[in-house]
């Protein structure tokens, strides 16, 4: 899921990309990539043993970013929040 914050006069637009990935041992990774468009980004990975825990963390991160003014630009495999 790609989220983008509208640009301001002082800075370039920011983005957050969230994804869930299964690792080789059956665990799950929540991958968060954040940064300003056109600049270097930061990637953080959080590991979970169960898919339900990873999905809950994904939804929590998504909701937190939506509250901060980010907008969904692209989502695959799930319905965008209303």
Residue ranges and their predicted role:
Residues 1-11, 51:
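Negatively charged, low-complexity tracts enriched in Asp/Glu with abundant Ser/Thr
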Residues 8, 32, 36-39, 48, ...:
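A generic structural signal for ordered alpha-helices
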Residues 40-42, 49-70:
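A short, charged, amphipathic alpha-helix used as a generic interaction element across diverse proteins
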């Amino acid at each position: 899921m790609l989220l983008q914050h509208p640009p301001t006069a002082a800075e370039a637009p920011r983005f957050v990309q969230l994804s869930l990935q299964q690792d080789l041992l059956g665990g799950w990774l929540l991958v968060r990539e954040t940064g300003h468009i056109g600049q270097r980004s930061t990637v953080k990975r959080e590991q979970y043993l169960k898919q339900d825990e990873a999905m809950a963390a994904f939804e929590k991160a998504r909701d937190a970013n939506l509250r901060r003014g980010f907008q969904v630009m692209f989502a695959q495999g799930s319905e965008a929040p209303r």
